[in-house]
């Protein structure tokens, strides 16, 4: 019997550096486990734009993300504007993607539901 674990059930593991970023094949597999709106942008970072009907909801959403980021000890870049919160995630120590980036993305998606 095989037991599978969704990304949102896992815990981010702090990166100390010295490990290679994920390869494209691994990135594509993990990206397929996220909601469709996530992309890998031109900088090689996970990127998603969440849309809202006003200014306060993106602020509130960003605060939820901040609390989650502290809990996971993994911190995304957030950009807030009227009607939107843009999330950009990557592992800063290696300037690339690790599984923890995808775990955080999956957990952020749960905050909006």
UniProtKB/Swiss-Prot annotation:
<dbReference type="InterPro" id="IPR036428">
    <property type="entry name" value="PCD_sf"/>
</dbReference>
<dbReference type="GO" id="GO:0006729">
    <property type="term" value="P:tetrahydrobiopterin biosynthetic process"/>
</dbReference>
<dbReference type="GO" id="GO:0008124">
    <property type="term" value="F:4-alpha-hydroxytetrahydrobiopterin dehydratase activity"/>
</dbReference>
<keyword id="KW-0456">Lyase</keyword>
<dbReference type="InterPro" id="IPR001533">
    <property type="entry name" value="Pterin_deHydtase"/>
</dbReference>
<comment type="similarity">
    <text>Belongs to the pterin-4-alpha-carbinolamine dehydratase family.</text>
</comment>
<protein>
    <recommendedName>
        <fullName>Putative pterin-4-alpha-carbinolamine dehydratase</fullName>
        <ecNumber>4.2.1.96</ecNumber>
    </recommendedName>
</protein>
<dbReference type="Pfam" id="PF01329">
    <property type="entry name" value="Pterin_4a"/>
</dbReference>
């Amino acid at each position: 019997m095989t037991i599978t674990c969704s990304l949102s059930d896992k815990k981010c593991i702090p990166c100390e550096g010295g490990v290679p970023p994920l390869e494209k094949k691994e990135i594509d597999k993990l990206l397929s486990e996220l909601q469709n709106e996530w992309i890998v942008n031109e900088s090689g970072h996970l990127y998603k734009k969440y849309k809202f009907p006003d200014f306060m909801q993106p602020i509130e959403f960003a605060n939820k993300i901040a609390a989650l980021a502290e809990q996971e000890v993994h911190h995304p870049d957030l950009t807030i504007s009227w009607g939107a919160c843009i999330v950009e995630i990557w592992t800063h120590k290696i300037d690339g993607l690790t599984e923890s980036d995808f775990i955080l993305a999956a957990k952020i998606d749960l905050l909006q539901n």
